[in-house]
Amino acid sequence: MSSCVNTSQTGPKKKISFIIRDEHEYSNRSAVSALQYDAQNGRLFTGGSDTIIRTWSVPHHKDAFSARGGVRSPGKNSPVQYQGSLEQHTDWVNDMILCGHGKILISASNDTTVKVWNIERDNKHGFIDCIRTHKDYVSCLAYAPIVEKAVSASFDHNIFVYDINANFKTVNNLIGCKDSIYSLATTPNLSLVLGAGTEKCIRLFDPRTNEKIMKLRGHTDNVRALVVNDDGTRALSAGSDATIRLWDIGQQRCIATCIAHEEGVWTLQVDSSFTTVYSAGKDKMVVKTPLYDFTKSQLLFKEEAPVKKLLLSEKDNPVSLWVGTWKSDIKRWSIRPSAQLSIGGDEDGPSTSNANHSVSASSSPPVTFKYIRVKDQKGQQSTPELVIPGAPAIKKHAMLSDKRHVLTRDSDGNVALYDVLAARKIKDYGKRIFEEVVDENSRQVYIPSWFVVDSKSGMLQITLDELDALSSWLSSKDAGFDDNDRETKLNYGGMMLRSLFERWPPCKMTNVDAADADDVQKATLNFISLPEHTPLIICEGNGRPLYRLLVGDAGKEFEANELAQIAPMWVIDAIERNQLPKFNKMPFYLLPHPSTNPKQPKKDRLSATEMLQVKKVMEHVYEKILSTNDDITVGSIPLNQIHTKMEMYCNDQRLEPDMDLRTVKHLYWKQSGELLLHYKPVK
């Protein structure tokens, strides 16, 4: 299945990307920032920085098991079963909501889109629609179940409302936020929408009139999470200022502040009675706090990494909590009441006044409750009741000097080598020192960069653009191919494009045999067939995705037709018309080496392709200069032995005959001016 928006081929410049990954990505990689639980069917939906939404069959609490050691891998004997993946996003998944009576999942992503999925149990494909109302990262979603409306908010300052029953038609654009929006909440009947973010204030809207109602101030840093009660009278907010604030919406003011956390609070969950809040964030602590008394915060447990998302498995009398963190593991923790924890007051429990305390709606000033050092408490739980293990994510990468291979180190400390042209991992080094392996694989060669690599998804993503993709010419020998022919020139970018579009009919039609190929056609003949599961993405110059498909699907009728409409013209020119840029010319000067004490050194200015080898320059010097110079005596020798009778230098560094001028200039000359070479006969 593919996702596409039609744009003219003559419009803004486009890029193409592909992801190097396993055929089946069963486990989350890196951070998990979005969770939804379908209690009726026992399904958990997870999403995060690896762009993939996964579905898991998980046991109910009565089937929960002792998690000593946790779950190590999905399998027949595991209580957790991987069910499938939803793969259309091209960047981090930030939020998800279940709607349509549990039949529809909506997801929001940094790829600027909101996507709609059919998640009925008998539907394996899922993708319904792609909503492109936003122009920047879509950070959060909210759901009004009574009226079947969904709400999205973005870094583009906009809040949109969609009618689920009308094919997700956009029915409102709530305008008024002046900065990026990080958090969103709505009442079940959509009578009120709250949005907040980097403005440090909370804005309230009435979607029925599209009007701004009020603005709530109090946070001193970004507001990262919002919750509102069903009747729209109270709201909770959490911020990077490490506070949780309770608001009386009627009075338009903060009536209580909780400062139990040490660092930013990023996620909140509240039970259905709006009496208890569960919070977590950067300090890794998961805390339970009764709303009637913010001094009664209890440390439930502490995670191994900052917490991105909390999700109660049920809102009525909750007994467990799903947790997603900056790590790839997902855990379910029991939050059943354990032994009574005494916090404040005397040892017999809270005082009568505290126990009966409720937040007053009077005109009294906001209350900041006494600080309780939650971090000094012993957590009520030490082991999760369920663990869905994640996979290691690539955390560091380096492009090698050959501009074909990328070395990586993952979150487990393992080092691996990837071949970009083949879109595959080709070697595992285990737990080695990264820099040492880079040095082992580095060569004394300069090749222009023709792609950009990033690993923010936990996997390698390779991006090619019009300016650089076809700039990398090199000899077949330098490219590492078996023929070792320095006369045959290859273009890495052209080869990569042929690999990516190999199955697309217009590309197939231009394939030729080596015997019949001209020099331009030979430049891409050695392309490598890629794994069919490789995702291919066409995007705008700013990275906004236009089309996503699998490399193996490019030959299918629907995908082929879409590619014909969306493929960038520079790609079509390269693979359909064999149009590649010409070799770059490089001017350089030749002078006798100062050690030869030339009487009147003549400075010859020449020009050649930047891939010309030093030994070719030596042949020129031998034939045109040394052989006619009465002051220098050289014997008559075969051209292929000239390097035994003379040497070439740049900045007093002796050059290897197999080096090309491009490498000499970038590794030895290192100046903006024209290259200067010295020659010296060997006696």
Swiss-Prot record:
Q: What is one process in the GO biological process aspect for this record?
A: positive regulation of protein localization to cell surface
Explain the consequences of disrupting this gene. Changed locomotion behavior with mutants displaying decreased reversal frequencies consistent with decreased glutamergic signaling.
Q: Where is the composition biased (Low complexity)?
A: 351-364
Output the Gene3D superfamilies linked to this UniProt entry.
YVTN repeat-like/Quinoprotein amine dehydrogenase
Q: Name one GO molecular function term.
A: ubiquitin binding
Tissue/organ expression: Expressed in several head neurons and cells in the tail including the anal depressor cell.
Q: Which residues form a coiled coil?
A: none
Q: Which UniProt keywords apply?
A: Repeat, Ubl conjugation pathway, WD repeat
Report residue spans for region: Disordered: 341-364
Q: Where are the WD repeats?
A: 27-82, 88-130, 133-167, 176-215, 218-257, 260-299, 302-343, 389-428
User: PANTHER family given for it?
Assistant: WD REPEAT-CONTAINING PROTEIN 48
Please describe the quaternary structure of this protein: Interacts with usp-46; the interaction increases the catalytic activity of usp-46 in the presence of wdr-20.
Give the protein family.
Belongs to the WD repeat WDR48 family.
Full protein name: WD repeat-containing protein 48 homolog
Q: Which gene encodes it?
A: wdr-48
